[in-house]
Amino acid sequence: MKRQLPTFVTFVLVLAALGLSYGAGMKKKVVAPKDFPAGRPFSAGIQVGDTLYVSGSTGADQKTGKVPERFEDEVQLCFDNIGAILKAGGYDFSNAVSVQVYLTDMTLFPRMNAVYIKNFPEPRPTRTTVGVTALAGAAHMEVTVTARK
């Protein structure tokens, strides 16, 4: 029994050290461009370790809240907004590993895709595209991104 106690204590100390080092690297850090509007009920991005989770972004102008009339301009502005969040965390589109796209009209898919491929370099991230009935404001699309260094 006396020999087992030091082994058990060593085992517990090793587990505790592993738990502390794991938890220390898992702190959440808010990532946002300097011009990200204040007072929103969500963060633009959250970095945990080397992974950045970007909130759903639309093609609305960050200052005016207006969505461009031409859909392709809305898509590009959406990716510009995402790019600003990525850049604020020291990432870019090449770091994207997963993308979720929400479209209010699936007939817009080919037009969205044409702009999408100009923004995401090869190898492109995994992607899910979902048709939805509505999004906030006048947005026709919303995109979330997970990026990793």
Predicted segments — roles?
Residues 4-80, 84-89, 94-97, 103-149:
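N-terminal presequence-like segments and the immediate start of the first folded domain
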